[in-house]
Design a protein with these regions (language model features):
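Short alpha-helical functional segments enriched in proximate histidine and acidic residues
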Residues: 59-66, 201, 205
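Intrinsically disordered, low-complexity linker/assembly segments
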Residues: 148-180, 184-186, 194-196
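Charged, conformationally dynamic linker/hinge segments
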Residues: 1, 170-172, 195, 199-207
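Helical lid/core segments from catalytic subdomains that handle acyl or acyl-like groups
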Residues: 89-145
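Gly/Ser/Thr-rich phosphate-binding loops and adjoining beta-strand/alpha-helix segments
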Residues: 4, 19-51, 67-83, 135-137, ...
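Acyl activation and transfer enzymes in specialized metabolism, enriched
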Residues: 37-62, 175-194
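Plant-skewed but cross-kingdom recognition/interaction modules and surfaces
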Residues: 115-123, 127, 161-162, 178-181, ...
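Conserved GHKL (Bergerat-fold) ATPase module
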Residues: 2-3, 21, 81, 113-117, ...
Length: 207
């Protein structure tokens, strides 16, 4: 992670307009067709949350704005992406686990299992925010929700995605997601592009 001059980037105007806004976060809603990864999860015994996190990481690496993030009033540049997941720990509470994104599916899956177990057992968060731009996620897989807004803490500016229980239809299985992002980091067009790429990655996942 290193500081960059906003004026030397495509985010110069956004930094000036949105950095000091009372609430600079924007939320998009989208319904994804997750039929393919639900089938893969069932047939291969892979965790659906891991498959979602992998596809999110794949999509994020294809949008250059994900490699920049406003942190502490400055614009920072990152070389790598990580995907965060929330883990139920051994104390009956939850812990945070940052997963380094690897395009190698087997490597990402191995890291997912190892790190989530480590965090669950130790009750100690695994934090990569000083070295990677972290995409936050929260899966409320037991509950039916239509979306979530108002997740801005004023401290963390990271993009964040939340979803609930998927819905089975006659021809496809769908998942409603909310995607929260800081307007300094990206514009609506970048966020929409990311969500379109995410849908494509889900439909084309080879595992």
């Amino acid at each position: 992670m290193k500081e960059i001059n906003p004026k030397d980037t495509t985010r110069a105007y956004a930094f000036e307009m949105w950095m000091q806004a009372p609430n600079p976060m924007v939320t998009f809603f989208k319904t994804l067709d997750v039929s393919r990864i639900v089938r893969i999860s069932r047939r291969k015994g892979l965790k659906l949350n891991m498959l979602m996190c992998y596809c999110i990481g794949r999509a994020a690496t294809q949008v250059k704005e994900f490699y920049m993030l406003p942190v502490g009033g400055k614009l920072m540049k990152f070389d790598t992406i990580a995907v965060n997941t929330i883990v139920a720990n051994s104390a009956g509470e939850v812990s945070s686990c940052d997963l380094p994104f690897s395009d190698d599916f087997a490597q990402f899956g191995s890291d997912y299992l190892r790190l989530t177990k480590q965090v669950a057992d130790s009750c100690v968060d695994h934090d990569l925010s000083s070295e990677s731009m972290v995409v936050g996620t929260s899966a409320l897989a037991q509950y039916e929700i239509d979306g979530a807004v108002g997740m801005y803490s004023g401290i963390f500016n990271n993009p964040f995605m939340i979803w609930g229980k998927y819905k089975r239809g006659l021809f496809k299985t769908t998942l409603a997601i909310s995607f929260l992002f800081h307007h300094t980091q990206m514009d609506g067009a970048h966020a929409a592009k990311f969500l379109d790429i995410l849908q494509r990655e889900i439909k084309n996942l080879k595992a």
